[in-house]
Amino acid sequence: QSELGLIESINTVKQIDSVNIFLGAAAIPGEEFVLTELGPEYVMVDEYSSSNGGIRISRFDYLRQDDAKNFILSKSNYMQAFGISAKTNLDLSSMKSPYYEVVIRVNASDESPLYFSVSCGENCQGTLALPLSPSNAWQTISIPVRCLEREGLDKSQINIRSLFLSQGSVNFDLHSIIIKEENESFSDISC
């Protein structure tokens, strides 16, 4: 019976239907970081300002029960970013058609693009511009992993699980990032 239990647990591990990346904060084992022209810095507190002052982060209540974070990126000559990495790679190859579900709100922007990227190492990433609503309302954006794969991502060895990048001035709120199994052929991003 112990062998049967082991086989069942192995099969369960292979049948991933969702992966939490960010729910008001990075989901374990993820680590939050920012990237400026000075390099990466890990974010260990709820109220944070990057060493160059170009990125500010604060935490707030989303719909009274969940947490969310506010990000203010200042205009820069360099790409600035907020991301979530992990020491262990994430393998999505057991998922048939995974997609990222991002719940986000843009509060203010100079209309520069806000990019979403996922990385699997040096010269191995997929990056797309997010289709953001200027209405200052919460929106749920679906990003198929297949679109990121077409841009160069290898979904079997993800190490930077999500990255938001911009050179522009943008103030946005982030509630959640969840990788789900696509059950319909919908998406907010065509690839």
Language-model features, listed with the residues they occupy:
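Extracellular carbohydrate-recognition regions
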Residues: 3-64, 183-191
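Short, surface-exposed loop/turn motifs at beta-strand boundaries within globular domains
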Residues: 55, 66, 95-99, 158
